[in-house]
């Protein structure tokens, strides 16, 4: 499937994304990919799908530099799934999404220094010492916006009300089938909100791959998910083969 590739500027990004959702019925946000585009700056690629006809498009936008930070308007108001996807981009690339209600890290510790998927990230062991203390806890998050003068404003927001009862499910719990922590906010027996903490077994595979040859990366795809190791390996190999223009024999197709 070939994607229609769209490039949007910072100024028309919010309005054009709204048109794609509401007028062209791209109702499914498949993913958001944060990228370090070198001299272009930091930006995102959004993969959208129209679930009526299965048409897909990709949207690229470059973040605007404001007061030393890279910012892009949030699309949480259009696609609710963007809430976690934008937090992941912020966590690894450092882009702040204007209007996002909960701009915290998602995978890495709150006291982690830097954004590891930036090309200039310092990979030295001295700069990435394993912390010996517990992760700092906070009942607050932050929302970013631009004021009338175009400056970046950080607004502190509470995560919990005074009467909220918070239960931690995980990091290790038999019902989660994996290592994650769910801060579950209860009102009596009703679940009001869940704040996920997802980075307990995150190993930085994306960053490790940057210094490897293609064959060396194959063992790491198998470790992404023990239920679908072969599927991940086929996905990576397929992209490499297509990019190199390799024609596969019938034997390979049959084996796969």
Predicted segments, located by residue:
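Terminal low-complexity/charged segments
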Residues: 1-190
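Active-site- and interface-proximal helix/loop "cap" or "latch" segments in soluble metabolic
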Residues: 169-256
């Amino acid at each position: 499937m070939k994607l229609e590739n769209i490039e949007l500027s910072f100024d028309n990004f919010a309005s054009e994304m709204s048109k794609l959702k509401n007028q062209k019925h791209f109702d499914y946000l498949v993913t958001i990919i944060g990228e370090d585009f070198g001299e272009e700056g930091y930006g995102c690629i959004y993969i959208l799908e129209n679930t009526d006809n299965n048409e897909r498009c990709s949207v690229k936008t470059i973040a605007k530099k404001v007061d030393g930070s890279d910012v892009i308007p949030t699309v949480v108001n259009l696609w609710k799934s963007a809430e976690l996807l934008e937090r992941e981009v912020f966590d690894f690339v450092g882009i702040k999404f204007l209007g996002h209600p909960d701009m915290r890290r998602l995978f890495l510790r709150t006291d982690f220094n830097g954004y590891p998927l930036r090309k200039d990230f310092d990979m030295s062991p001295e700069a990435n010492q394993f912390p010996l203390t517990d992760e700092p806890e906070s009942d607050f998050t932050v929302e970013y916006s631009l004021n009338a003068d175009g400056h970046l404003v950080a607004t502190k927001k509470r995560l919990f009300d005074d009467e909220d009862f918070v239960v931690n499910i995980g990091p290790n719990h038999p019902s989660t089938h994996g290592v994650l922590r769910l801060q579950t906010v209860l009102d009596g027996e009703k679940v009001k909100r869940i704040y996920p903490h997802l980075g307990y077994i995150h190993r930085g595979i994306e960053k490790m791959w940057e210094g490897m040859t293609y064959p060396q990366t194959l063992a790491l795809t198998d470790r992404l998910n023990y239920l679908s190791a072969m599927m991940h390996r086929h996905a990576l190999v397929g992209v490499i083969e297509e990019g190199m223009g390799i024609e596969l024999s019938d034997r390979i197709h049959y084996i796969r």
